[in-house]
Regions:
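N-terminal cap/lid segment of alpha/beta-hydrolase-fold proteins
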Residues: 32-76
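Conserved alpha/beta-hydrolase
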Residues: 103-120
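Gly/Ala-rich beta-loop-alpha elbow adjacent to hydrolase catalytic centers
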Residues: 158-162, 166
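N-terminal targeting or regulatory segments adjacent to alpha/beta-hydrolase or S9 domains
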Residues: 1-50
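The serine-hydrolase catalytic nucleophile loop
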Residues: 88-101
């Protein structure tokens, strides 16, 4: 068969499954199954790139954060690398579609991960946290050990909530040499204040599930 067509159709299918999760909370019984299908199809499609997209895991506090790495080219020559971080409702697979192609076309390695609160991690009890620089540091720890990453040209790009997480991480980690943000949520308080749950009474909050309490 035609590998490019196969790759494109697998990635298209992955994104269709991903779109079905847009308005679904992680405590929905279908969330885990569909999320796993997103990952399965994406990895099958990613394997058909040249070089193939690599799935990797970042050790973090006794568990791991899932991510993807697309090399700029074959071989282990160190080159500039872009790490992308998403926001409140993103999957690492989303972020690949967002800018990986553009990064690759400009000679960058591209990496992205799910931080606590993102992707399927809420199903493991890993919800958002205020010290997001801690998991980002763990990601950088993994990246700088790769022979194909130029440690003097590691940059990070964040969208939405990631537009807050990225500069925060750079404040704590000088290994991040440059940052860029898009539609950054730099103050979450006004955003959360517009959400119905923020207006719940103590009696209503007593009926929250453990998932909602964590979020």
């Amino acid at each position: 068969g035609h590998l490019v067509s196969a790759r494109d159709q697998l990635l298209r299918a992955a994104y269709y499954y991903r779109l079905s999760l847009v308005s679904m909370l992680p405590d929905n019984p279908a969330f885990k199954e569909r999320g796993a299908k997103v990952r399965e199809l994406f990895q099958k499609g990613g394997a058909l790139f040249d070089p193939p997209v690599e799935y990797f895991e970042v050790p973090f506090e006794g568990t791991s954060l899932p991510g993807y790495f697309r090399k700029a080219a074959s071989g282990d020559r160190p080159v500039k690398t872009l790490l992308m971080i998403g926001g409140g409702e993103t999957f690492a697979e989303d972020l690949f579609f967002y800018i990986a192609h553009q990064a690759h076309a400009r000679g960058y390695n591209f990496a992205t991960v799910d931080l606590p609160g993102q992707g399927l991690l809420p199903l493991e009890g890993m919800v958002f946290r205020t010290d997001t620089h801690a998991p980002v540091k763990a990601v950088v720890d993994v990246l700088v050990k790769r022979p194909d990453v130029d440690t003097e040209r590691l940059s990070a790009f964040g969208i939405s909530g990631g537009g807050l997480f990225v500069p925060q991480a750079a404040m704590f980690d000088p290994r991040i040499k440059a940052v860029a943000m898009c539609s950054a949520v730099v103050d979450a308080r006004p955003l959360f204040a517009t959400m119905p749950a923020a207006l719940d009474t103590p009696e209503e909050r007593a009926d929250w599930t453990s998932f909602h309490e964590g979020v």
